[in-house]
Amino acid sequence: MTRQLDLILKEGGANYDWKTEFEVQPQYLDARGKGWLAHGLEELGGKGSFPLFEKIQIDFKIGRTLILWDDELVFNRYRGITFRSEMYEEFQFTFLEGHKRLCRTYEKEALKTGMQQRLWVGSPLATRIFGQPSEPGDFHGVGASGWKLLAYNHLQVDLLSRIHGFKLIRLSPYETLMTAGSLKRLDQLLINPKEEQRSMLYGWLMRKLG
């Protein structure tokens, strides 16, 4: 999907960076921010000190705006838990309410790919922090340690992007746009879009930049 978005931005003449990163400055994280991350980890059932990114991978960077594509796996109960953080009351994110709703609605879609061992269990870091996961598909007990780490990492990206002075836009497959008189999902529109659809999508992205 990001490849198609890259082509749309390029065709529209946008000045942007694709598949880039920014380096985290740990000194920007104050006591309040550390508290938000520690509490987020605890709410997900994590133990120990919270891990902090050294660099954050970004799909697109346009000026001081970062754009990330969130795939189906993102939208689950654990990401929903992170959205309860006081951080989201302190900072405004345009995607917040929509993403909260998607987490409540589309967990079954996350399960279609997310029960794979590498995703459900996650990395050794995931099991160290959250413990040994339950069987794939079973949310009792520990549940999905890999999913939990992913949710925590997204909380971390939201916070770190803001304290580094960036605006963050998160795109989802489930966003709907009006085209040719009907609503279509973003992921469907990005499959071989026609010229007029590419132009419409470019305009839509530019409006999101504000």
Predicted segments — roles?
Residues 1-210:
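Nucleic-acid endo/exonuclease domains
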